[in-house]
């Protein structure tokens, strides 16, 4: 879910936005100064939008300082001209700046008029802010979304599945999970998590009682998350992952099921595996919207890059072609056959 700050446009910027609707301006630079959205610069239309693009946008960008760029295109919509919103957030900017700009983008769109903004571009390098970078973005955006490994499996399964006639005599075999009850402390900890008191919870299953208990509730930094995963026992983990992606700020609940290989007993592995789905249903009933479910062997897997890739898979525009496998090494020389001469 995306969150907003209380930052609003100042009076000067509001006036600029009003004048922009008549097509006078080609570009408007917006910065956050003194907890307000402020007008950093404007430039009027000179030629067509493509020839103006690099000449007008490039000089407005500072290497280490984020900003928003509103760029007027030449295409018309019922309200007037369509606009491109560029969120310039360089990698060298501070984390606080990245968070503030990501959280304020929705407010900027509302202040300017969301209906006028027909395209958006999130840029972290100066190259992405060029006309060529914009064209690459358009090409990438038009590509189909990548499939997860699970979706790929389902796609292949549908190609080969056999359609069977179903009638009243058809029998179905199902295997449901084990619904382990939650302790009172566990329910209270989840409710505190939803209220914002914690951002990390760890749960264990009491194998004798067959009940789920909370074993840790705390505010944990992402860098310390791997240390929370035990090396000798299975656990469930619930983490509120605060991050930015393409200029937007997200707070996403990530559920992690950690199972450290075969160091656990067979019963422990079976209990954690069987209780997982019903436990997730219980979390949903308590108001926790789990965005991603993960299974890991070791806490070292829980890095920011790993979580970003899991929540926001990167598009793969071209699949690599696999080389033809080599034949057996001792295949022998080729055998030639000569046609028999006919008398």
UniProtKB/Swiss-Prot annotation:
<dbReference type="InterPro" id="IPR002108">
    <property type="entry name" value="ADF-H"/>
</dbReference>
<dbReference type="GO" id="GO:0005737">
    <property type="term" value="C:cytoplasm"/>
</dbReference>
<dbReference type="GO" id="GO:0098793">
    <property type="term" value="C:presynapse"/>
</dbReference>
<feature type="region of interest" description="Disordered">
    <location>
        <begin position="319"/>
        <end position="343"/>
    </location>
</feature>
<dbReference type="GO" id="GO:0003779">
    <property type="term" value="F:actin binding"/>
</dbReference>
<dbReference type="GO" id="GO:0005938">
    <property type="term" value="C:cell cortex"/>
</dbReference>
<comment type="subunit">
    <text>Interacts with G-actin; ADP-actin form.</text>
</comment>
<feature type="domain" description="ADF-H 1">
    <location>
        <begin position="11"/>
        <end position="135"/>
    </location>
</feature>
<keyword id="KW-0206">Cytoskeleton</keyword>
<dbReference type="InterPro" id="IPR029006">
    <property type="entry name" value="ADF-H/Gelsolin-like_dom_sf"/>
</dbReference>
<dbReference type="GO" id="GO:0003785">
    <property type="term" value="F:actin monomer binding"/>
</dbReference>
<dbReference type="GO" id="GO:0030016">
    <property type="term" value="C:myofibril"/>
</dbReference>
<dbReference type="GO" id="GO:0051015">
    <property type="term" value="F:actin filament binding"/>
</dbReference>
<feature type="domain" description="ADF-H 2">
    <location>
        <begin position="184"/>
        <end position="312"/>
    </location>
</feature>
<dbReference type="GO" id="GO:0008407">
    <property type="term" value="P:chaeta morphogenesis"/>
</dbReference>
<protein>
    <recommendedName>
        <fullName>Twinfilin</fullName>
    </recommendedName>
</protein>
<comment type="similarity">
    <text>Belongs to the actin-binding proteins ADF family. Twinfilin subfamily.</text>
</comment>
<dbReference type="GO" id="GO:0007298">
    <property type="term" value="P:border follicle cell migration"/>
</dbReference>
<dbReference type="GO" id="GO:0030833">
    <property type="term" value="P:regulation of actin filament polymerization"/>
</dbReference>
<dbReference type="GO" id="GO:0005884">
    <property type="term" value="C:actin filament"/>
</dbReference>
<keyword id="KW-0009">Actin-binding</keyword>
<dbReference type="GO" id="GO:0048488">
    <property type="term" value="P:synaptic vesicle endocytosis"/>
</dbReference>
<dbReference type="Pfam" id="PF00241">
    <property type="entry name" value="Cofilin_ADF"/>
</dbReference>
<keyword id="KW-0963">Cytoplasm</keyword>
<dbReference type="GO" id="GO:0016319">
    <property type="term" value="P:mushroom body development"/>
</dbReference>
<dbReference type="GO" id="GO:0030837">
    <property type="term" value="P:negative regulation of actin filament polymerization"/>
</dbReference>
<dbReference type="GO" id="GO:0030042">
    <property type="term" value="P:actin filament depolymerization"/>
</dbReference>
<dbReference type="GO" id="GO:0005886">
    <property type="term" value="C:plasma membrane"/>
</dbReference>
<dbReference type="InterPro" id="IPR028458">
    <property type="entry name" value="Twinfilin"/>
</dbReference>
<keyword id="KW-0677">Repeat</keyword>
<dbReference type="GO" id="GO:0051016">
    <property type="term" value="P:barbed-end actin filament capping"/>
</dbReference>
<dbReference type="GO" id="GO:0007274">
    <property type="term" value="P:neuromuscular synaptic transmission"/>
</dbReference>
<comment type="function">
    <text>Actin-binding protein involved in motile and morphological processes. Inhibits actin polymerization, likely by sequestering G-actin.</text>
</comment>
<dbReference type="GO" id="GO:0010976">
    <property type="term" value="P:positive regulation of neuron projection development"/>
</dbReference>
<dbReference type="GO" id="GO:0010591">
    <property type="term" value="P:regulation of lamellipodium assembly"/>
</dbReference>
């Amino acid at each position: 879910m995306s969150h907003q700050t209380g930052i609003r446009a100042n009076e000067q910027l509001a006036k600029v936005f009003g004048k922009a609707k008549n097509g006078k301006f080609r570009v408007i630079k917006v910065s956050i100064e003194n907890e307000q959205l402020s007008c950093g610069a404007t430039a009027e239309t000179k030629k067509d939008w493509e020839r103006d693009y690099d000449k007008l946008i490039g000089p407005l960008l500072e290497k280490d300082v984020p900003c928003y760029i509103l760029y007027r295109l030449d295409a018309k919509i019922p309200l007037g001209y369509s606009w491109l919103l560029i969120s310039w957030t360089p990698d060298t900017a501070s984390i606080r700046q990245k968070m503030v700009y990501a959280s304020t983008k929705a407010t900027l769109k509302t202040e300017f008029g969301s209906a006028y903004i027909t395209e958006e571009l999130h840029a972290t390098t100066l190259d992405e802010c060029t006309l060529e970078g914009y064209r690459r973005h358009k090409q990438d955006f038009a590509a189909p979304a990548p499939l997860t490994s699970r979706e790929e499996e389902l796609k292949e399964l549908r190609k080969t599945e056999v359609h069977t006639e179903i009638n009243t005599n058809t029998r179905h075999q199902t295997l449901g999970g084990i619904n382990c009850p939650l302790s009172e402390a566990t329910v209270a900890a989840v409710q505190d998590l939803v209220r914002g008191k914690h951002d990390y919870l760890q749960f264990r299953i009491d194998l004798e009682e067959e009940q789920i208990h909370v074993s840790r509730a705390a505010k944990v930094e992402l860098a310390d998350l791997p240390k929370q995963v035990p090396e000798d026992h299975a656990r469930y983990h619930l983490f509120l992952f605060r991050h930015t992606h393409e200029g937007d700020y997200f707070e996403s609940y990530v559920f992690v099921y950690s199972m450290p290989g075969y160091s656990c007993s067979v019963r422990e592995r079976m209990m954690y595996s069987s209780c997982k789905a019903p436990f997730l249903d219980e979390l949903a009933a308590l108001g926790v919207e789990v965005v991603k479910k993960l299974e890991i062997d070791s806490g070292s897997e829980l890095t920011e890059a790993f979580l970003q890739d899991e929540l926001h898979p990167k598009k793969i525009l071209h699949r690599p072609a696999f080389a033809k496998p080599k034949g057996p090494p001792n295949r022998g020389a080729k055998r030639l056959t000569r046609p028999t001469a006919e008398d």
